[in-house]
Amino acid sequence: MADFNEYKGVWVFCEQRQGALMSTDFELVSEARKLADELGCEVTGLLLGDNVEGIAKELGGYGADKVLVCESPLLKDYTTDAYAKVVCDMVNEYKPEVLLIGATNIGRDLGPRCAARLHTGLTADATHLDIDTAKYIDFLKESSTIDLSKQKFDMEDRNLKMTRPAFGGHLMATIICPRFR
């Protein structure tokens, strides 16, 4: 099992087309901000393309602390192999504990490939995201002066809970990947 203490931060794969960010990017960055606040870490956008550095600053207004920009003429338009390689290389180098990818056509192509290459889980069509902090509830009740952003927790307890519809939408399933980040 990996040392989860190496993993830090919530990342969002930011999708652009013809040099413009997609609306899902802003939604995901806002959701990432909530998760990062709970984890006490930063939100990082990952933006791939060609001549896209100028649009990266737009993500800050939605909660991104920083944006990593990977520019190349080869990344101007989405291609599965190129984008999967760059995303996986960046994740392996920087080790975010959460990576969010939108449920767009590109996201549905890229997400499973990255999950397989990174040997981690993937939940498609999640409708709710949360951090499993159950072990800390009693601790927090005992002390109302605790600033969560300054606390160090056992990383194995910081699981992302992903909720999605199951069985034709008649049931909601909550999924965690406790052995992977």
Where are these regions (language model features)?
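N-terminal glycine-rich FAD/FM-binding segment characteristic of electron-transfer flavoproteins
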Residues: M1-R181
